[in-house]
Regions:
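Active-site groove signature of glycoside hydrolases
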Residues: 121-151, 198-201, 313
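Short, acidic/polar
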Residues: 35-49, 114-130, 178-186, 292-303
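N-terminal export leaders
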Residues: 3-7
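Glycan-binding loop/region signatures in secreted carbohydrate-active enzymes
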Residues: 99-103, 238-300
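C-terminal motif of bacterial Sec signal peptides marking the signal peptidase cleavage site
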Residues: 15-17
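Conserved, mostly hydrophobic/aromatic
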Residues: 54, 139, 195, 236, ...
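Substrate-binding surface in catalytic domains of secreted glycosidases
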Residues: 64-75, 150-262
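Glycan-recognition patch characteristic of GH18 chitinases/ENGases
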Residues: 22-121
């Protein structure tokens, strides 16, 4: 029995075997990199336990898989050339209903109406994933409604079953933090090995300016989802960049661009004591910036660990505080 538990604890540090750990087994902290579809050409630091480097969408007409982004085109996993002796990052692929500028929930609905089409699409995804040597599959079907749950389950289950039949890839489902009606954790856990909970934005591009994610908001939402699914089956999604609100609207901004704008406006970037976010305002230039940095990410990971969650996924890394990557490298032991 002891040998079995030790084996599970060791293989669970890789995404290729990221099934939930048995109760009582304390895993080390895992930090994943969720690279955006527009991340091509960015510097790819080492230290991550897993990297989502390929994005595949469902074509709105044919329902066939279409690769919209592949960060690494040379066949290597990110982190493979680590000089620090870190274990190479396990690669994951994201299957998403996002295309253009929005999620297409209508594609999932239409696909679910034809069982044959679901089977063909699932098989096509499985073949593509097998050829890409993905060790994990992240299903990203956001902005569905509560009445769509059965359709969401049908499509997700078909893709998951087909993927498992073709490879040992783990299945992860990305879900929002707050919408338990459309994305009930216990139900979705019947399909997915892990649930990646996006714990942001508290304030985003569709809201007035404010903290992107505060520690209190993060802890409350993560605690709710962890209680639904179990701490061993949750991955906490954390933002790593910022948002600027100005006369043109709101959009994401990188840490370095935010620092540059603040310097040009002779405006200090201060830490908001209530949320822990960095904040800068320029009345002269008409913008308001809220920003995530290394210190905030460390705090959020500490809060998640107190709850019992051990897996964390960082989004928006192409715009992150450069010091964050040093934290990731130090957080991941070469002995894993």
């Amino acid at each position: 029995m002891t040998r079995r538990i030790l084996t599970v604890a060791l293989v669970a540090t890789t995404v290729g075997a990221c099934r939930p750990l048995p109760p009582g087994v304390r895993a080390p902290t895992e930090i994943w990199a969720i690279w955006s579809p527009d991340s091509r050409g960015v510097s790819m630091p080492d230290g991550f336990a897993a990297t989502a480097e390929t994005w595949i969408t469902i074509d709105t007409i044919s329902f066939r898989p279409t690769i919209i982004s592949r960060v690494a085109d040379d066949g290597t996993s990110l982190g493979q050339q680590s000089a620090a002796g870190l274990v190479p990052a396990r690669r994951a692929s994201v299957i998403t209903s996002f295309q253009g500028t929005r999620y297409h929930a209508d594609v999932i609905r239409a696909l679910s109406e034809n069982a044959d089409a679901v089977g063909v699409t699932a098989g096509a995804f499985a073949s593509l994933l097998s050829s890409s040597r993905a060790q994990a599959v992240i299903l990203d079907f956001q902005e569905m409604a509560a009445e769509d749950l059965e359709m969401l389950m049908d499509v997700s289950r078909a893709i998951a079953d087909s993927s498992r039949a073709h490879s040992a890839a783990a299945i992860i489902m990305m879900i929002p933090a707050a919408d338990s009606a459309a994305y009930p954790a216990r139900t979705l856990g019947r399909v997915a090995d892990l649930l990646l909970v996006k714990l942001f934005p508290e304030h985003g591009v569709t809201t007035p300016a404010g903290p992107i994610v505060s520690a209190a908001w993060f802890t409350r939402r993560l605690g709710q989802r962890a209680s639904e699914a179990g701490v061993n089956r949750v991955v906490a999604g954390i933002p790593a960049d910022g948002i600027i609100w100005d006369r043109r609207g709101a959009r994401r901004i990188s840490y370095l661009d935010a620092v540059r704008l603040a310097r040009e406006a002779s405006t200090p970037i201060i830490r908001d004591p209530a949320s822990g976010n960095l904040h800068a305002v320029s009345s002269r230039d008409g913008w308001d910036i809220w920003l995530v940095d290394r210190e905030l990410v460390e705090k959020l990971i500490d809060e998640g660990r107190r709850i019992g969650v051990t897996r964390f996924a960082l989004f928006g890394l192409e715009g992150a505080d450069p010091q964050l990557f040093e934290f990731v490298r130090r957080a991941r032991s070469p002995k894993l």
